[in-house]
């Protein structure tokens, strides 16, 4: 049987128990790189933020970025980890074009933080504890871009380009212990865990935490074992999954794939795999290496790091409000019900709503736009809401137009679609598409007269006191004006025309 065949998720859950493990890589937002003075800036021209240390030129020596160490300690504390009094760097040796030194400076058996945990709240309020094995410091690799072939993949590419701007960017890798007992909620837990880590590092201010930029990337490990068996199965590792939705889908897919392999009687291969968003599937990468294959040894050019207890406590005192407490405060500040706030958190738009309120919207308006308009569009596009790129200022501008009577809610939704299509600002789109509300009563009265003439029975009902029947007339006027009338003003004019009190 092909290792890419799958069973249904329900069939897999009937037979097997999933065991998960995650390695989340967090890029730190320091001004310079981990071991060099080269700038740590996203989006610059390729190979412009590189120096001789990043390229491993002969005779150069690395210098540790103190801010990166402090950020790493803060992450460890926020994950309820113990902070090592002494830790050291190690060389992880492998040969790949994105690693010009032919080794990555990382940490092996002496990480800076270890033995922590994170309590994860699922969509129904269930709390699941994920134990943290370690959080260690390392440097990022460069970025390869595969040219030609299919969708930028290495398979079938004509050649590859390498950008070393990312080489040497400081990373913290957070590694969980095996996660057992999630059962059919494993995909949901995967998404919620990565979301919680992202929220923590963003809250700490140590990372921009934008998954679409690769600031937070997840390697998801999955294995299956028959129900009742203690021994773990063979695992696969899906590399560099870079959205919350993709993490959930990748774990679900791998559970189904493993189940199909095991049902066929074939062994699961221990390997890395690549996630493809377009097909929602993984493909084989390479056989998974053990630590011995990397020939780790202590970095001879860097002395051990000593994190005194005084230093650690000073950093602990600077930690911001924990995310769980922040959520409680925001819910109280915004006046959302438990259900409303849980929906906001589950939709992943809490930060966006907070930013929209800070830009000038009320809590009610911000929730209306994000939950009522943007979340649905994100689902249709199969992306996370934040990936749509809607700015808080755009929401505020749109809502002001509605409140001022320049456009109605239907037009505002059309303008939002224009913004997402890159047509410009809300004001520019309104002008280009001719979406202004009809404010002249003359054309409205003409449309009202036509609608009343077309539905005399409805007009009689309204005159007779059944004012609720007015909706049919309003609908006719809105259709005649192509939705460009103010429904409230139309209602007023209809009642005036019929001599009925509102």
From Swiss-Prot:
Q: Does the keyword Signal apply?
A: no
Keywords associated with the record: ATP-binding, Ligase, Nucleotide-binding, Protein biosynthesis
* Superkingdom field: Bacteria
Q: Which reaction does it catalyse?
A: L-glutamyl-tRNA(Gln) + L-glutamine + ATP + H2O = L-glutaminyl-tRNA(Gln) + L-glutamate + ADP + phosphate + H(+); L-aspartyl-tRNA(Asn) + L-glutamine + ATP + H2O = L-asparaginyl-tRNA(Asn) + L-glutamate + ADP + phosphate + 2 H(+)
| SUPFAM superfamilies assigned to the protein according to its UniProt record, in alphabetical order | GatB/YqeY motif, Glutamine synthetase/guanido kinase
> Which PROSITE patterns does the entry mention?
GATB
User: What are its E.C. numbers?
Assistant: 6.3.5.-
Q: Specify the signal sequence span.
A: none
GO MF annotations, alphabetized: asparaginyl-tRNA synthase (glutamine-hydrolyzing) activity; ATP binding; glutaminyl-tRNA synthase (glutamine-hydrolyzing) activity
Gene Ontology process terms (BP):
glutaminyl-tRNAGln biosynthesis via transamidation; translation
Question: Which Pfam families does this UniProt record tie to the protein?
Answer: GatB_N, GatB_Yqey
NCBIfam families, alphabetized: gatB, PRK05477.1-2, PRK05477.1-3, PRK05477.1-4
Concerning HAMAP family, the annotation shows: GatB
Please explain the role this protein plays, according to its UniProt record.
Allows the formation of correctly charged Asn-tRNA(Asn) or Gln-tRNA(Gln) through the transamidation of misacylated Asp-tRNA(Asn) or Glu-tRNA(Gln) in organisms which lack either or both of asparaginyl-tRNA or glutaminyl-tRNA synthetases. The reaction takes place in the presence of glutamine and ATP through an activated phospho-Asp-tRNA(Asn) or phospho-Glu-tRNA(Gln).
Q: Which family does it belong to?
A: Belongs to the GatB/GatE family. GatB subfamily.
Q: How does it assemble?
A: Heterotrimer of A, B and C subunits.
Q: What is this protein called?
A: Aspartyl/glutamyl-tRNA(Asn/Gln) amidotransferase subunit B
- Give the originating organism: Arthrobacter sp. (strain FB24)
């Amino acid at each position: 049987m092909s290792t890419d065949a799958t069973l249904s998720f329900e069939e897999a859950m009937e037979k097997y128990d999933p065991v998960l493990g995650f390695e989340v890589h967090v890029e730190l937002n320091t001004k310079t790189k981990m071991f060099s003075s080269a700038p740590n800036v996203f989006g610059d021209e390729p190979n412009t933020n590189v120096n001789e240390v990043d390229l491993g030129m002969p005779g150069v020596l690395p210098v540790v970025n103190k801010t990166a160490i402090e950020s790493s300690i803060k992450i460890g504390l926020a994950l309820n980890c113990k902070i090592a009094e002494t830790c050291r760097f190690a060389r992880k040796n492998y040969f790949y074009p994105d690693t010009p030194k032919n080794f990555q400076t990382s940490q092996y058996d002496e990480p800076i933080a270890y033995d922590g945990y994170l309590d994860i709240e699922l969509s129904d309020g269930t709390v699941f504890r994920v134990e943290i094995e370690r959080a260690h410091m390392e440097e990022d690799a460069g970025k390869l871009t595969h040219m030609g072939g299919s969708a930028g993949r290495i398979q079938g590419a004509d050649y590859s380009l390498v950008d070393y701007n990312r080489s040497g960017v400081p990373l913290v890798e957070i590694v969980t212990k095996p996660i057992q007992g999630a059962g059919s909620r494993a995909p949901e837990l995967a998404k919620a865990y990565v979301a919680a880590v992202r929220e923590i590092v963003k809250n700490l201010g140590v990372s921009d935490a934008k998954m679409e930029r690769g600031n937070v990337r997840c390697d998801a490990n999955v294995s299956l074992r028959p129900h009742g068996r203690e021994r773990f199965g063979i695992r696969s590792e899906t590399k560099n999954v870079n959205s919350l939705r993709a993490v959930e889908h990748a774990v679900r897919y791998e559970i189904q794939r493993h189940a199909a392999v095991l049902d066929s009687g074939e062994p699961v291969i221990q390997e890395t795999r690549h996630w493809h968003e377009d097909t929602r599937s993984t493909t084989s990468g390479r056989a998974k290496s053990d630590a011995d294959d990397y020939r780790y040894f202590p970095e001879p050019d860097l002395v051990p790091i000593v994190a005194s207890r005084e230093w650690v406590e000073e950093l602990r005192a600077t930690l911001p409000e924990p995310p769980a407490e922040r959520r409680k405060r925001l819910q109280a500040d915004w006046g959302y019900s438990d259900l409303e706030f849980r929906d906001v958190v589950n939709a992943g738009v809490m930060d966006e709503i907070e930013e929209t309120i800070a830009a000038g919207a009320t809590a009610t308006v911000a929730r209306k736009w994000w939950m009522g308009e943007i979340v649905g569009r994100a689902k249709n596009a199969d992306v996370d809401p934040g990936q749509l790129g809607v700015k808080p200022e755009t929401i505020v501008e749109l809502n002001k137009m509605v409140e001022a009577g320049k456009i109605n809610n239907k037009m505002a939704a059309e303008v939002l679609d224009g913004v997402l299509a890159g047509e410009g600002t809300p004001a520019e789109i309104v002008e280009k598409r001719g979406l202004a509300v009809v404010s002249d009563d003359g054309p409205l009265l003409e449309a009202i007269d036509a609608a009343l003439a077309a539905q005399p029975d409805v007009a009689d009902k309204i005159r007779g006191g059944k004012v609720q029947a007015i909706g049919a007339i309003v609908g006719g006027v809105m259709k005649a004006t192509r939705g460009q009338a103010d429904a409230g003003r139309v209602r007023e004019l209809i009642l005036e025309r019929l001599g009925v009190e509102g």
